[in-house]
């Protein structure tokens, strides 16, 4: 790479950062950081722990954006200074390092822009992820368990904490249903890309004739809310609370007492289970939190449907609306039908490497909103 080309790239990066800064409302973010940090020094700050944690999370999110931008800005200035030194005295090793830094910088800007896409009202929240197999018995239940492992691996790779809140094993293999609570900054913002029907095509290990089978599993993702984030009133007469023994993956008993909780909301038919804690009280609190989140999500979806009717739009619902196909046979391919993102590295995807699919979906939704 010639020095003139290096300079063009650096100037382009500087212009990109200037455009990003213009869209960030930078001064307002820095003012908010100052206000949050003043709140954190108040003597009664920890009196309400949920509210305090919410302030800390919001402050950390803002600082991540502001500090991330400053780091990129400083790196551009460092590259400019190195380029100016090379103008005075050409050093092959220094030039080679600068070339690599210029090439690597594009990926850093792309990742920063991706972070900025997660600006939805609940993107920063933890995520509640549910998997349900489609028709097909053992085949689809096994597929649901493969997706479970994929999301567990993805969560670990992202540094998220993944908890199994509810688990109902399949009769022979796999799972009939499973609920994960995925904790971490922007967990919902990323994982909302996974909501929909996932399709598997493979030679079935359960078919002695070695025939090819197609299986489906649905993934539902909603944000976890703090109690003060949403206003959802639940009439005690509208719910039934049942207790049962908790059991985990593989059938092992987590607790021999009836600490697990099932809450049924009769007006909507929504059922939530929680068996993650040893305490029945804590499981009930967590289950009520999940129920409120589901009712809030239902309310949002009803509003979206009303708007779609006004606009004359129709959305497909059901097993025909697959978002992604995972083909193991007769060839290896994972393809997202919304963005056309695809890869032949099926094993890597099943090991949790779904980042490219999530990133392409986030950019796709940004482009859709711009249009």
From Swiss-Prot:
Record keywords, A-Z: Cytoplasm, Methylation, Protein biosynthesis
Pfam families: PCRF, RF-1
Subcellular location: Cytoplasm
SUPFAM superfamilies: Release factor
Entry-annotated residues carrying N5-methylglutamine: 252
SMART domains the UniProt entry points to: PCRF (SM00937)
Gene Ontology CC terms, in alphabetical order: cytoplasm
Changes after translation: Methylated by PrmC. Methylation increases the termination efficiency of RF2.
A GO MF label: translation release factor activity, codon specific
BP-aspect Gene Ontology terms: viral translational frameshifting
Biological role stated in the UniProt entry: Peptide chain release factor 2 directs the termination of translation in response to the peptide chain termination codons UGA and UAA.
Name of this protein: Peptide chain release factor 2
Organism, scientific name: Staphylococcus haemolyticus (strain JCSC1435)
């Amino acid at each position: 790479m010639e020095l003139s080309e290096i300079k063009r790239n650096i100037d382009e990066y500087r212009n990109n950062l200037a455009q990003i800064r213009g869209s960030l409302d930078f001064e307002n973010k820095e003012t908010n950081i100052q206000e949050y940090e003043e709140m954190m020094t108040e003597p009664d700050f920890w009196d309400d722990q949920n509210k305090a944690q919410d302030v800390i999370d919001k402050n950390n999110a803002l600082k991540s954006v502001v500090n991330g931008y400053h780091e990129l800005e400083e790196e551009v200035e460092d590259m400019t200074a190195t380029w100016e030194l090379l103008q005075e005295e050409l050093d092959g090793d220094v030039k080679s390092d600068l070339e690599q830094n210029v090439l690597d910088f594009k990926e850093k800007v792309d990742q920063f822009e991706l972070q900025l896409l997660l600006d939805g009202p609940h993107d920063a929240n933890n995520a509640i992820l549910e998997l349900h197999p489609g028709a097909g018995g053992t085949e689809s239940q096994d597929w649901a368990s493969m997706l479970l492992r994929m999301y567990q691996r993805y969560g670990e790779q992202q540094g998220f904490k993944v908890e199994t809140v509810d688990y109902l094993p399949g009769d022979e293999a796999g799972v009939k249903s499973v609920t994960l609570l995925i904790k971490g900054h922007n967990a919902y913002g990323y994982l909302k890309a996974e909501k929909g029907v996932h399709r598997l095509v493979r030679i079935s290990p359960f078919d002695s004739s070695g025939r090819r089978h197609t299986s489906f599993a649905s993934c539902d993702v909603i944000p976890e809310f703090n109690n003060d984030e949403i206003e959802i009133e639940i009439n005690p007469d509208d719910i039934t609370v049942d207790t049962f023994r908790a059991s985990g993956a593989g059938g092992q008993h987590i607790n021999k007492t009836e600490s697990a909780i099932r809450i049924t909301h009769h007006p909507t038919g929504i059922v939530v289970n929680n068996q993650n804690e040893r305490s029945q009280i804590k499981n009930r609190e967590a289950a009520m939190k999940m129920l409120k989140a589901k009712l809030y999500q239902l309310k949002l979806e009803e509003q979206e449907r009303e708007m779609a009717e006004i606009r004359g739009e129709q959305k497909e619902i059901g097993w025909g609306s697959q978002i992604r196909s995972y083909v193991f046979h007769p060839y290896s391919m994972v393809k997202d039908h919304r963005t056309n993102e695809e890869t032949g590295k099926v094993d890597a995807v099943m090991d949790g490497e779904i980042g490219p699919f999530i990133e392409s979906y986030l950019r796709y939704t940004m482009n859709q909103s711009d249009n």
